[in-house]
Amino acid sequence: MSDIHYISTETLNLESIQEIIVNQMKLELSEEAKVNIQKCRDYLDKKMESNSEPIYGINTGFGSLCNVKISNENLSKLQENLVKSHACGTGEEVPAEIVKLMLLLKIQSLSYGHSGIQLQTVNRLVDFYNNDILPKIYTQGSLGASGDLAPLAHLSLPLLGEGEVLFKGKKVASAEVLKHFNWEPIVLQSKEGLALLNGTQFMGAYGVHILIKAYKYSYLADLIGTISLEAFDGRIEPFNELIHFIRPHKGQIITAQRINEFLEGSEIIEQEKKHVQDPYSFRCMPQVHGASKDAIDYVRKVFKTEINSVTDNPNIFIESDQIISGGNFHGQPLALALDFMAIALAELGSISERRTYQLISGLRNLPAFLVDNPGLNSGFMIPQYTAASIASQNKQLATPSSVDSIVSSNGQEDHVSMGANGATKALRIMDNLERILAIELMNASQAIAYREPLKSSDFIEMFLSSYREIVPLVKEDRILHYDIEKTISFLNSFQIENDLLTMA
């Protein structure tokens, strides 16, 4: 396998991005990309030499200042001013892995030859990626229309030798890093600042990062839910394929199939049951988990289109000799999708917490709170409180961002997507889902021990054996905070196959 990923018109998807990340591949512009970028830049330079008409963002001001004409001698300064003036983010810093994704997605978008960027500017972004020079970017500041202006301004500052970067684990001034590599700051030419700042790469990077985790934790929700089902002495009939073939939602069918595969050979599931039905949180896993799968799959399709698109403005079309000002920077497709994914992930957490509640309730020959000597020991009473608190927070965070819009730029930008807020909220929900599922695994693994000497399937027994090496059985009260943190780390280290990135 090559250790280089060539930026080209070849479609990026979750699988290829995961491969780039896991294998720590370097980036390089393909010859096709280099030609496309250079042709577009040459066209724009010639156009500006012979054209005196105002062209938005190239020889005019920005936003509501679009009617202010800028002289040719100030075109470079205009772009530099744009980057500096728009670098006004605040709040928490964007995680390093998402910043690196932003670099990848910005390079991809600029490579198609519709942006007018200099080849050396894109190459410098490639250098940043390959050398893990990660600009310091903040989570707050983007309206998700005119693109992710503030975050992308911070992404672009180091090109000018401005701002700060994370390099070799330390925050350092960008100018120092340029000096370290003997690089000169980039002198931006006409339109370049706009090409860099207009775009949806903040929302895009968050979405890709969350999606990769969502597919993994959708799988883990099925697995942990299946362990809970067995621990609760649940019935297998609700997962019979006949039920799901007459309501053939893809996610529902996949979930039922997966649960049956997890349970293959289990003694616990095959033992005679005294109860007729199980609560919905067990019985309806295919319908609930499956609906979240279908939502995640829809979101994947939206982001696949977006990360292979040109999202700056104006766009340059050499073949038809046109420079067209449009609105590809508007993040509405992503904003709606991120809100949808947030709801889907919150629901996986909501139903997980309900299974945890059932397990500690002293039902079906399980001890109250899953511990010997209940009363003297409180056992797993309070982890359920924690899960309930987090599930409630997720419900609050799942309130859509995309229904809001605030007028900006003197009314010129009178409708915005707020997709960036949706992106950061969705990541918080994703992180919360990890914690809720970790708490369910703690409870399920404890409860299933009370079904011994009956065994589960070989797969589940192997999974639980690996888990027990990290988190021992609870025999008497201990500080469970540490168990929660160890369980989260265990789930984070759990690897899934790449083909699951298209099957939540």
PLM regions: where:
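FAD-binding core of FAD-dependent oxidoreductases
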Residues: 56-70, 74-78, 85-110, 138-160, ...
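Short, low-complexity, polar/charged sequence segments that are solvent-exposed and flexible
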Residues: 74-77, 121, 214-216
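Well-ordered mid-protein domain cores that form the structural environment of catalytic cofactors
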Residues: 104, 112-134, 143-152, 157, ...
